[in-house]
């Protein structure tokens, strides 16, 4: 079988198997990362080394830690998920060996690969990415920062329904272009909770599941023409907060430079991988963002306020800036 090339987060990926949720990469481009997906029948035992990182969140079925990361003696990393998916990332971050157990699937593996695993690879390469969605608003992008329950995916889909392009729903890699700070596009799919699908489309079954092992629903942005593949300078960064009782929500509020630094540093993607050089690069990049780009608090109002109205408030703020 011929290898397949894809583009995501500024990287050209070459995989030995087709993967969903990724935009194609030209055959003339040199791959930055080779992905070898191995037979699920050979899923290995856990490494004997002490885990470098153990997640606080637990698998509902087994009660085991959802993610364990091992750093091997050759400086490579193994990311092992309780769902039966494992990734061995080479020390130079140019190769990934991916495996999944018989009770898992290629689709399950891909959902981890295209989000947290590639986010980890970016981190290994010294690329600073935010836990954020990125939206194409014309000749520039806006970045909406927030944790896993901030509503980034739902908000991204609503922006798409208002005619904007979605560049990424969860990982927003930053790049410095002269004095400007830009954001690169990521994957072509959005993962939505059933409650969000019901809110947006009237029924939780309006979109298909990613797989039988995962409750989240899959929205293919490329199929609907809502994916933006452009790298764009950032017009503004919005830190999402859900103050349902705020009388003026949805609204946009200014943040001091100090508060902006704290919020952005707290939302650096894959910050479990840490060393001094990376920390210095983080500080430099975040300082550049705060120095050159408006960083504001965006109060959504939670589910008590229509998401469409929140998106309109943000777009009005972008136009007024």
Regions found by a protein language model. Name each.
Residues 152:
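Conserved lysine of the Walker
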Residues 1-104, 312-321:
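Long, basic/Gly/Ser/Thr-rich N-terminal segments
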Residues 155-156:
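Post-Walker A alpha-helix
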Residues 39-40, 57-61, 96-98, 103-107, ...:
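A broad, low-specificity signal for short, low-complexity segments enriched in glycine/proline
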Residues 80-141:
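Extreme N-terminal, non-catalytic leader segments
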Residues 2-32, 133, 137-147, 161-321:
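Glycine-rich, often acidic-flanked micro-motifs
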């Amino acid at each position: 079988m011929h290898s397949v090339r894809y583009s995501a987060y500024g990287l050209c990926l070459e995989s030995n198997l087709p993967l969903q949720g990724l935009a194609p990469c030209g055959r003339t481009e040199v791959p930055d990362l080779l992905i070898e997906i191995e037979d699920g029948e050979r899923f290995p035992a856990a490494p004997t080394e002490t885990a470098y990182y153990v997640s606080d969140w637990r698998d509902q079925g087994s009660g085991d830690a959802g993610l364990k990361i091992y750093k091997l003696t050759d400086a490579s990393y193994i990311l092992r998920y309780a769902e039966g998916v494992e990734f061995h990332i080479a020390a130079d971050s140019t190769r990934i060996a991916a495996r999944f157990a018989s009770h898992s699937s290629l689709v399950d593996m891909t959902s981890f690969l295209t989000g947290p695993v590639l986010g980890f690879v970016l981190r290994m390469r010294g690329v600073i990415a935010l836990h954020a969605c990125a939206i194409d608003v014309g000749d520039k992008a806006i970045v909406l920062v927030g944790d896993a329950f901030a509503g980034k995916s739902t908000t991204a889909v609503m922006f798409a329904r208002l005619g904007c392009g979605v560049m990424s729903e969860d990982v927003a890699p930053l790049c410095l272009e002269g004095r400007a700070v830009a954001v690169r596009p990521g994957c072509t799919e959005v993962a939505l909770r059933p409650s969000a699908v019901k809110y947006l489309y009237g029924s939780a079954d309006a979109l298909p599941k990613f797989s039988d092992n995962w409750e989240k629903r899959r929205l293919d942005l490329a199929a609907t023409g809502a994916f933006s593949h452009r790298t764009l300078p950032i017009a503004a960064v919005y830190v999402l907060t859900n103050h349902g009782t705020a009388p003026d929500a949805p609204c946009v509020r200014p943040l001091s430079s100090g508060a902006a630094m704290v919020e952005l540093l707290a939302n650096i993607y894959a910050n479990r991988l840490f060393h001094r050089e990376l920390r210095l690069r983080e500080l430099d990049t975040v300082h550049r963002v705060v120095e050159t780009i408006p960083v504001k608090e965006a109060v959504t109002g939670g589910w008590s306020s229509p998401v469409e109205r929140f998106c309109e408030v943000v777009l009005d703020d972008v136009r007024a800036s």
